Amino acid sequence: LAKDEAEVATAIFQNVEMIEAKHRGLDVDFFSFKDWGVPDFLQLIFITSPTILEEQKEVLTRFIKVIRKSIDYISQHEEEVKSIYFNYTKQDANNPVLNEILTATLPQFVHDFSMSADYYDRLQQWLKQTGKIEKTIDPKSYWTNRIAF
């Protein structure tokens, strides 16, 4: 887009690429895939096998608890979190683009890790309709919210 070699970009993040493009002076707009029948795919999803889930349930439950505490910390200490980020990544803390991206991104972390089997069923139905997969399976065979709460 910046070199005028394309008119559209897909799978961009509104809180990253849109901000960067606007800072570059590009005339950009955003549309959500879900408004056009493509399932949303921007959730934080943790994946494991049924065996590991059974064998390590206690550890994984503690892991989710730590993630939630981290999200609390992010939301309650935004400036400190930005400082940690800039220090760790060795980025310029005065960079207005990165500051705006972080300001837009930090509130995106939420506590609700749950997803419905219906969501995954709609996703796989869309994948089948668009020829990406040949058959669908019962989402309950690969999705659980057992430790999401």
Where is each model-derived feature located?
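Conserved C-terminal helix/tail region of periplasmic/extracytoplasmic solute-binding proteins
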Residues: 121-149
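Residue-level detector of short coil/turn "hinge" positions at structural boundaries
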Residues: 8, 28, 93, 134-135
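Generic structural "secondary-structure junction" signal
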Residues: 48, 54-55, 111, 135, ...
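Secondary-structure end/capping motifs
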Residues: 54-132
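Pocket-lining segment of extracytoplasmic ligand-binding domains
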Residues: 2-88
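Short secondary-structure boundary/hinge segments and terminal tails
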Residues: 19, 38-40, 103-106, 144-147
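Short loop/turn and capping residues at structural boundaries
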Residues: 12, 32, 97, 138-139
